[in-house]
Amino acid sequence: MKNPMMTTLLAGGLVACASQPTPPTESATMPSTRDASSTVAVEAATANPLLGLSTLPYHYPPFDRFRNEHFMPAFEIGMAEGRAEIERIAANPAAPTFDNTIVAMERSGQTLGRVSAVFFNLTSAHTNDELDRIDADVSPKLSAYNDAIVLDARLFGRVRALYEQRATLGLDAESQRLLERYYVNFIRAGAQLSDADKDKLKAYNEQLAKLTTQFQQNVLKETNDSAVVVDTRAELDGLDDSAIAAAAAAAKAKGLDGKFILKLQNTSGQPALAVLKNRALRERLYKASIERGNRGNDADNKPVVAAIVQVRADRARLLGYPSHAAYQLEDTTAKTTAAVNKLLGQLAAPAVGNARREAADMQKIIDAQRGGFKLAAWDWAYYAEAVRKQRYDLDESEIKPYFELRSVLENGVFYAAHELYGLSFSERTDLPKYHPDIRTFEVFHDGKALGIFIFDPFKRDSKRGGAWMNSYVDQSALFGYKPVVANHLNITKPADGQPVLLTSDEVQTTFHEFGHALHGLFSNVRYPLFSGTSVPRDFVEYPSQANEMWATWPKVLANYAKHYQTGEPMPLALVAKIQAAEKFNQGFATTEYLSASLLDQVWHQLSPEQARVSDVAAFEQRALANAGVDYAPVPPRYRTTYFSHTFSGGYSAGYYSYIWSEVLVADTDNWFKENGGLKRENGDWYRERLLSRGGSVEAMQLYRDFRGRDPIIEPLLERRGLTPAASR
């Protein structure tokens, strides 16, 4: 399990589509200390399954034994143990050594790390009201726990002394990097501040821990409460029978027999918008989506956003940075706001230009059908499908019967991993589950046990939106741990007896998230700090996006894209259509993404004075206009009030990471094609030089070790249809 304190120092939050949920790190103020020897703690220690290392294979969590009442006592005991361990290190009368200081800190906090891994993963994947209350209570306490460590002058003095003599310590490369990371992370966490400023920092961190927790809980509540109730089946014309049955089941579960409920996904756009023929219902669904957190109710996120932005800006200045974005980006591969602004600005104008051309094509169809209206945001997905049908003779309903979930996973995702890396998978039905829908697999590399993979595919009210990977057990040679990782999706579960048929986007997401899982499974490092996805935010999305290329690789596609009823492979003519349409609608896709990325940057590049925003909605509109991406038919992928990535998910000033990583991905795609594609020797090269090394080597050096040079941007421009030749 990753040491939660050092996870904080390295990453500072949840990776929304990537790695382990970690204790909130934007918090502080010391909680009242409860001694682990108290009556409650002693009783909990004798019966609490969170307090001991799991005896299941790979230390897999005993989900069937966990109860809500176990968590708070386990957190209290874990923090008490961790404080005692850190106190022994800080007060050690012996001169600091790498082992008695740095390695000792890596070994500390095991109980707390174990509790945190389970708890924060469950609050994302399968929460309830009691877990939410515990989350709100424990988040500021954990932040205070972290602050007490990183702001301890004695501890930092030992780290600094070692850092200053690092050239004489005879450390190997990974140990040298570990020492350097500890030193830098302590400084970034405020270790060099005065005592008075440390107190201010703790107060800021405590505020942020509470605010970011509140933001995410509001998003989940609003997403559930904003689901659209439909009175008649006729209004759902265009949805397939499986989707209609799922909508009926959702309504029945809410006591609305005879009606239908369209649940919302986390993005502004909703899948049903592509097929619903009823324009009024499309408008209702779209507006329900984009007004989340903006309805003036008790879950309105506008005041929460304003407070988060202000406190982050104030904290950045206290730490010596002009803005929160400047602080965050210093520890990434981008390094500066100027570099990020340059990339986003370089892409914005051509992306919007492509989107306008795409809109013109759709308007022609509307006019030809005598629609009598101008294309609106709720029309885009529907008429994009019409254009795709017209231009490529292709529509989603023709594709979905070939994308059955089990086949996509086992004959697609797992097959590609076998061909590239020699992986094999054995389902473990004997291991406990936190929800009946999950599947658990033991993973083998050339027949040798590698780790555990948990697959949690379906949307439910207890699960946050989106898709992500997390870790329950991080690989570490220091502890002898093998990884236990999980992928979470939000696929709508069909009615009983109906097949689970995926959209093209859902297939891509399944491959994407498994790219993160591979990053965790292949980790081969000594220290927990460097395990798996413990890399900069703008690098962590690289392995996941790179894995997407195999979804449409001919040999892989032929192995999994088979009709769910007949078993017949997807016809070659249909495959050719899919390949021909790969760049279709890229103007929209790039613009909606860039709009959200630019919003994230504008919010977080504010100085403390500029951050005093009174009207969140007006600020958002001005920001989009100033960036040249305020094109009404293409809303941001996330509007501010439900932008969990940046206001609660660890991607603050970091949502640009997807397009930044895609520069590497497009270049990597070319490398595989140049070297024969889906071959074991290619997979081994990529695994050994990049996937297995986690954060133990500087991120761009890993890329150079793999590719032999720095990345170039031209493949991305071609891939996104942003060059003249590729724009149509």
Kindly give the residue locations of the regions a language model identified.
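Short His/Asp/Glu-rich catalytic/ion-coordination signatures at enzyme active sites or charged loops
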Residues: 55-70, 119-138, 161-203, 263-303, ...
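Bacterial N-terminal signal peptides that target proteins for export
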Residues: 1-6
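N-terminal helix-rich structural modules
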Residues: 26-241, 672, 728
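Intrinsically disordered or highly flexible coil/loop and linker segments, enriched in small
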Residues: 80, 84, 88-95, 111-128, ...
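Short pre-active-site segment immediately N-terminal to the catalytic Zn-binding motif
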Residues: 492-511
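C-terminal, non-catalytic "cap/extension" segments appended to globular domains
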Residues: 32-67, 77, 237, 246, ...
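C-terminal motif of bacterial Sec signal peptides marking the signal peptidase cleavage site
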Residues: 15-16
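Active-site-proximal, well-structured secondary-structure segments within enzyme catalytic domains
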Residues: 174, 178, 210, 217, ...
